[in-house]
């Protein structure tokens, strides 16, 4: 198993290109099931989750070619509607095939999903919504079995709480349903917006894109004509590299970004004292004279993203005073706290609120990644620490960050990927 060895204390310099967004790419790949012909998707990040979903589609009878961030996928005629445990267990996003397969073929079986161990992330909201659209759903031997032999019917779906993958699943299901589906309390994330825009470009009538109420006119099981897709840049990767610049007190630029997707992150960096230059597709961060403590509450987009919480906790270790971080979306997303303490961090936990007491002198340590974003926080702490840090179980990192150590080394970091 691989681990990363980081020699800390290096100043970073230069610019880093931001990859396509994994969380946008996954629903876009799933949406090719709705297409009547092959679909090209470019700017795909070279990360494990993308390869896993492509392999899942191949298992279902799709064909694809994938090289240098460009995939050509033909999922127009699947030969199976069963997404098996051996692939689904490694990735939660596998559930995204449920909506499109059920809508198109009238039946789908998906093994209950795996992925990061950060809280329950129940798929009940997906299943209840599909039942409202006429599906019969049972759980058998660890599989969700969904049946709608006469197709799905448009309905009014009110999500009890905002769900990104739930919104995406129902948008795809509604695209091929009969009649009008209204989704109330829909997620507004840029990744959801891109999926809706791609489907609209393919002829599906969708109103309210970018709002919390989506109205979708279904095609009554008529496959759609999808065009080439360019995946939006990864706002979480972008935020992580901005934190890498901040935590090493460096001047660093990120390229190929959509700055307004990062508004909530940029506000917090400015509050902490980091000067920012923002233009159309680039952001440059400069060193802070003093790093100020910050208060962060995670929430759905356009609020502060839960996927940036761990990275800001690492950064807050260097702030002059106490920072307060409240996690409102997941109940088990502070697993990185015990690992950050191995660097010397002073963090007090009470329920879903972490108080980070700074400034802390960080020392290199052996640490273990617990989930995707927590692992990037450990890398950030390692960059700032004195001495050598070894980050173990980095398969979490490889699920979501493309060439992380290569990109950081190009900026002046000293990181090696080694085998245990």
Swiss-Prot record:
An example Gene Ontology CC term for this record: cytoplasm
Residues binding phosphoenolpyruvate, per UniProt = 22-23
The pathway to which it is assigned is: Cell wall biogenesis; peptidoglycan biosynthesis
Transport keyword on record: no
Active site per the UniProt annotation:
116 (proton donor)
- For the protein in the UniProt heading, the enzyme class is transferase
Query: Pfam families, per this entry?
Result: EPSP_synthase (PF00275)
Please name the PANTHER family in this protein's record. UDP-N-ACETYLGLUCOSAMINE 1-CARBOXYVINYLTRANSFERASE (PTHR43783:SF1)
- Which protein are we looking at? UDP-N-acetylglucosamine 1-carboxyvinyltransferase
Its source organism is Nitratiruptor sp. (strain SB155-2)
Lineage of the organism = Bacteria, Pseudomonadati, Campylobacterota, Epsilonproteobacteria, Nautiliales
As recorded in Swiss-Prot or TrEMBL, the protein's gene is named murA
